[in-house]
């Protein structure tokens, strides 16, 4: 069960980070460059 909880938490954080990067592309340009999965 712990593995599923960790996966859910990681996926939720990833979705939040993705939405934040998409909404604030200009402000988080430095974060979007190293990640490189925005587009």
Curated annotation (Swiss-Prot):
GO terms for molecular function: toxin activity. Belongs to the FARP (FMRFamide related peptide) family. Keywords: Amidation, G-protein coupled receptor impairing toxin, Secreted, Signal, Toxin. Negative results: has no effect on human neuropeptide FF receptor 2 (NPFFR2) and kisspeptin receptor 1 (KISS1R). Has mild effect on ASIC1a channels (31% inhibition at 10 uM) and no effect on ASIC1b channels. Expressed by the venom secretory cell of the spine. The spine is a cuticular structure containing a single large nucleated venom-secreting cell at its base. It is an independent unit capable of producing, storing and injecting venom. On the back of A.stimulea caterpillars, spines are grouped together by 50 to 100 to form scoli, of which there are eight. The keyword Secreted applies. This is U-limacoditoxin(13)-As54. The modification Phenylalanine amide is found at residue 37. It is found in: Secreted. The keyword NAD does not apply. Strongly activates (at 30 uM) the human neuropeptide FF receptor 1 (NPFF1R), a G-protein coupled receptor, with an effect that is equipotent to the endogenous RFRP-1 ligand in activating NPFFR1. Is toxic when injected into Drosophila melanogaster. Also shows a moderate anthelmintic activity against the parasitic nematode H.contortus (drug susceptible Kirby isolate) (IC(50)=20.1 uM). Residues 1-23 form the signal peptide. One of its GO terms (cellular component) is extracellular region.
């Amino acid at each position: 069960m712990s593995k599923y909880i960790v996966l859910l938490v990681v996926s939720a954080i990833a979705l939040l980070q993705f939405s934040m990067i998409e909404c604030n592309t200009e402000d988080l340009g430095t974060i979007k460059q190293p990640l490189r999965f925005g587009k």
